[in-house]
């Protein structure tokens, strides 16, 4: 069974983030995430959301370890008093050579020092396999429902073959509602296709960015757009293209959980 989760960007004002976090938890979402650009403090923003909630799982999507190494991640978790028992620590390779080796070393380092769930952000099959055989979870992104389902099947099969517990499988899905947000989605697509890793991902999979997101003219279209995501992965993480205005973001929180 697939559950819904929600993600906010670090650009979301703290007051809005706290309000939305409380609403996400009360509405029954399975987890709450924050992105973590290399030069921003995603963990600090997540701490704001943690303070506004009591039980929901908290995730990072994802901390780039080339910019924020594992020891710095752990220091920031301590500084912000993030509860490790609620933390789903998503990490990504970032930039540089030997990303698989860097991630494998980071998983070992973090697992020895924190009880948090260690989640690997993965675009390609080799990073997914690393997550399947070494991590507690795998976070997919920029995939269609069909690709997400196939990747989840592969991850579970690889974990079973390795004789280890099956990791959680999660997927980020960008969402926009209304003309203004649909325009922002187009801008996000243009940005992603300029990033080498994402450009390679789209070439490899043969999909376009617009095939991987939820683009709704209005909230009434959400049920039909969410339907293909049922029974794909463990959690579909909705990522509003913009949550700066509290009203539309609250409406999305309410409408999506009601539709799923």
Q: What are these language model-derived features?
A:
Residues 1-260:
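Active-site-adjacent structural elements that line small-molecule/cofactor binding pockets in enzymes
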């Amino acid at each position: 069974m697939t559950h819904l989760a929600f993600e906010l960007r670090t650009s979301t004002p703290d007051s809005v983030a706290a309000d939305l976090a409380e609403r996400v938890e009360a509405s029954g979402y399975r987890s709450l995430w924050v992105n973590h650009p290399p030069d921003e403090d995603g963990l600090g923003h997540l701490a704001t959301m943690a303070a506004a909630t009591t039980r929901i799982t908290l995730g990072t999507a994802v901390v780039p370890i080339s910019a924020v190494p594992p020891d710095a991640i752990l220091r920031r978790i301590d500084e912000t008093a993030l509860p490790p028992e609620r933390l789903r620590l998503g990490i990504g390779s970032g930039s540089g050579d030997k990303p698989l080796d860097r991630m494998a070393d980071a998983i070992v380092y973090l697992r020895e020092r924190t009880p948090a769930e260690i989640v690997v952000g993965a675009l390609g099959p080799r990073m997914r396999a690393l997550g399947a055989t070494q991590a507690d979870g795998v976070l997919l992104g920029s995939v269609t429902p069909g690709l997400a389902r196939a990747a989840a099947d592969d991850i579970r099969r690889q974990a079973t073959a390795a004789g280890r517990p099956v990791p959680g499988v999660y997927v980020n899905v960008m969402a926009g509602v209304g003309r203004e947000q649909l325009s922002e989605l187009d801008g996000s697509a243009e940005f992603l296709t300029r990033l080498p890793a994402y450009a390679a991902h789209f070439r490899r999979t043969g999909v376009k960015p617009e095939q991987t997101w939820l683009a709704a003219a209005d909230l009434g279209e959400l049920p039909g757009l969410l339907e293909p995501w049922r029974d794909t992965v463990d959690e579909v993480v909705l990522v509003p293209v913009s949550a700066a205005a509290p009203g539309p973001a609250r409406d999305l929180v309410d409408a999506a959980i009601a539709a799923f």
